[in-house]
Amino acid sequence: MLLSLIVTFLGAFLTLLFMRPIAQKIGLVDKPNFRKRHQGAIPLIGGVSLFVGNLCFYLLEWEQMRLPTLYLFSIFVLLVIGMIDDRFDISPFLRAGIQAILAILMIDLGNLYLDHLGQILGPFQLTLGSIGLIITVLATIAAINAFNMIDGIDGLLGGLSSVAFVSIGILLIKDNQLDLAYWSFALIIAILPYFMMNLGIPFGQKFKVFMGDAGSTLIGFTIIWILLLSTQGKGHPMNPVTALWIIAIPLIDMIAIMYRRLRKGKSPFRPDRLHVHHLMMRAGLTSRQAFLLITFAAAICATIGILGEIFYINEWLMFAGFILLFFMYSYSITRAWRITRWIRRMRRRAKRIHNKG
């Protein structure tokens, strides 16, 4: 087991070192613009690193993995499409179409789909029937794009995905599904080299890398894959509503932002600077402070989900809490300028009090 984790880490880490000059040579880099305020052209190779690390783990633990060929094929397609998008910018509708095809393959060949939503509406199981197939496709696209869209500041994608994988792993251990739990923690090991270099650890900003669409879509797909394995079928280790709490921050942020864009008559896929991390930085927080605060909030949400499972809290109550959280978040987004102005005022007041002291 330890050998697999070591090889996973080394595979991901060495891929970053190997791919840096190649990415710069072929133009697989992220250049600053009106939305992206980083310095210089940053290699978009985190996705390749994650894929290689994940592949190393799969090859060493092949017999323990579920549907390995289908999963590896799916993430390879996402990797290739993501790299093409990172280099040339392809249509978001084309990307969504490919994601839908992969979801259909997951349903047809892997028999992974949303059959029920648990008891989110009362003391009865909400069975979906054939409509569950459509909802599965939509949920797959949503999960992929939620993690893709939240990747806006250093460390955030690595932090949020690690929170999700740790939370899933804990619940899987509780249910004695050690193979899936082991993989969940191995995914964190595969992300770790990117996470460190994205934050400038240990080589500084000179070796900084970004995940890119290739990596963020791979993470989103992997999370929905594990969640489907964990929430559906008999004896599932977690309820579907718990999955909402585990990925609450990226999911709510995506839905709220897309709704706001549609309400303004814009494309839901049109980039802007209205995500939660942008608003926090506008309020005066640094990029590092925003990353830590959002990751902490995600950890709290995931903890609520875990505690709901451990203490058998009614699913409809957990769902009601999630809906309340969503509306509170949406309300804050629509009044972002007031909130950011109030936060800046409080920070200035606190600074004056500190200086007087």
UniProtKB/Swiss-Prot annotation:
Cofactor requirement: Mg(2+); Mn(2+)
Pathway of action: Bacterial outer membrane biogenesis; LPS O-antigen biosynthesis
Enzyme nomenclature, EC number: 2.7.8.33
One of the record's GO molecular function terms: magnesium ion binding
CDD domains documented for this protein: GT_WecA_like
Location within or outside the cell: Cell inner membrane
Protein name: Undecaprenyl-phosphate alpha-N-acetylglucosaminyl 1-phosphate transferase
Gene name tied to this protein: wecA
